[in-house]
Amino acid sequence: MKIFYSLIVVFALISNLAFAGVSKKEKKALIGLYNSTNGKHWVKKWDLKTPVAEWHGVKVVDDKVVEINLFRNNLMGSLPRDIANLENLTVLNLAFNAITGVLPRELSELKNLRVLKLEMNRIKGEIPEEIGNLISLEELSVFNNFLSGSIPNSIGNIKNLKILNLSSNHLKGTIPNSLGALTKLETLGLFENTLEGAIPGEMGNLRNLKELVLANNQFNGEIPMELGQLASLEIFQIQNNQFNSFKNLEMLETREFLVFDYDKNDRKIEFKDINLEKTRMADTKFEDIDK
């Protein structure tokens, strides 16, 4: 008889585990996102009566929500604060939608987040200083929104960042020196803001940088000689700024150059070791590239 009852208990435990699903807290957070972004009008809607693992764009591993990919899905409205309850999230891709409102500070509580893609939305307000708490982040892309204020110094704390794209917003102020600590960075996009001042010499620490786009801002002064250390650079766009000297660019290692766009300033830049057969150089006021 004891064996019989033991088998019943074991069977019950196995059944509970098999049908446990995601936690109530995570499911509630997902429903909050659905409701706050007008889920009934999404292109691909969620059937809230079905298991979470079956919801479009949601990846569940071991009963934990680890990815949300709702790219180009007609999300409208703001991001809810309880999105922080998705504590196992590693990827959040809500790009190419019509999300409004501000970036909730609670986003910074997603300590496992590796990818945050919110580009091509209508998000306004400042980038919260708490963004620097996302220490696992490898990609932060918020280009083409209505973000204002300055670039937070705390971004320099996100040491694993490889892609940082803040282009086409209303950001102002200077590039914080702290960005020089992002030594794993491969892409930095600050195009089309109202950023000003000189490029900090600390940028020369970004030895893995392949793409640096600073065009269409109000940067001034001379290009710092420290940029000569960026031997991996392939794309460098600095046109439509107010630089008064490009002399230090002649120190730039250019063996990997594919694209270089600048304002001519009545002066030809003599690069060393440049391969003119593979490099596009344009002394133009503006030339966009399709990647």
Model-based region annotation:
Residues 135-225:
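Eukaryotic tandem repeat interaction scaffolds
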Residues 62, 84-89, 108-113, 132-137, ...:
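Leucine-rich repeat
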Residues 1-24:
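Bacterial Sec-dependent N-terminal signal peptides
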Residues 86-168:
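A generic tandem-repeat structural signature
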Residues 206, 210-221, 226-290:
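Leucine-rich repeat domain C-terminal region
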